Amino acid sequence: MENDDIIAIVMAAGKGTRMKSKNSKLVQKIYGKEIVKRAVENAQKAGVKDIVAVVGYKKEEVMKVLGEDIKYAFQDEMLGTGHAVMQAKEYLKGKKGRVLVLNGDVPLIRPETLNKLIEKSIENKEYATLLTAIYDDPTGYGRIVRDEGGNIEGIVEEKDTNEEQKKITEINAGIYCFD
């Protein structure tokens, strides 16, 4: 599927403190290839040609891995996903079409899954579509809170969950499509 009218924003600024590494988590390798490189390549395999990486912590490492074929935006303060996306706003000016946002630490996401998310977003004429997953043990992930009709009411990060929300097994996969 060609996704010429889609721009991808890859969030690649995080510290990855839980990994306890002196290097960025994004340059750690899985089967010989850096995590962030796999995420970008999967977006490219999904037909997305216009990619912006939002870099911050150890940005030189991440930029060296990703090279010069993509654009960069800089996040000096780690203030969350929304703030990271806002750092790429100059690349969104005058753009028509969808914006695919994905975390740089999702190396195993399949291009087919990204295409299905984009297709559903277009088909349903949604302004915001997000990918979720069901985990037996959702510890550490943001929970998807839904209303009685099944509509998403919000995403509650692990540290902010109450006892009832801790039981929710549907998690935020960190991949979104916006119109």
Protein language model regions, located:
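Conserved core of the sugar-phosphate nucleotidyltransferase
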Residues: I109-F178
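Short beta-strand/turn micro-motifs composed of small residues
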Residues: A12, V55, N103, T132-A133
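Short glycine-enriched, charge-decorated loop/helix-capping segments at active-site entrances
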Residues: N23-K29
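Conserved N-terminal catalytic core of the sugar/cofactor nucleotidyltransferase
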Residues: M1-D5, K33-G104, L108-E119, E123
